Amino acid sequence: MEILPASLRDLGSLRRVEQACFLKDAWPLLDLIAVLTWPDVIRLKAIEDGLMVGFLAGDPRSSEHMAWISTIGVLPEYQRRGIGRALLRECEKRLPQPCLRLCVRISNEPAIHLYQQEGYLSVDTWREYYNDKESALVMEKTR
């Protein structure tokens, strides 16, 4: 498995990963184009056997002295192999901000557990954040 920078050439693969991982919450096409082209965003893809199996975008917000992990997803059949952890760690290396945040569905216990293992703490809950009205847990890592 390799972690590499992602680009607009990866749009089709990213769309497949996004739809497989997030079903009803998958980002629309224009948002995917934006995340692959927006300046300063850290875009990483996980490749296994020539296939994109995971993606992460990190959004540095230097004026706020923080960064957001905008999205992280690994194809379901490749989960629990350390790919999400590898993407997260590589992105953290590339983001200089002292504070990192992300949000996750409150029902996504495997992801919450991973983030806790990586030093993220729950700092807020956004009520009815997702399309189906499920709340999001906001997690933060200070370094």
Predicted regions and their residues:
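Extreme N-terminal starter segment of soluble prokaryotic enzymes
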Residues: M1-I3
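Acetyl-CoA-dependent GNAT
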Residues: P5-Q79, R85-R94, T142-R143
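Well-formed, non-transmembrane alpha-helical positions, independent of function
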Residues: S13, H113-L114
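Conserved hydrophobic/aromatic "anchor" residues
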Residues: F22, F55, Y78, L114, ...
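Conserved GNAT acetyl-CoA-binding A-motif
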Residues: L88, R94-I106, W126
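Structural motif
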Residues: L95, Q117-E118
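C-terminal "cap" of GNAT-fold acetyltransferases
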Residues: R101-I112, E118, E128-R143
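A secondary-structure capping/hinge motif
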Residues: S122-D124
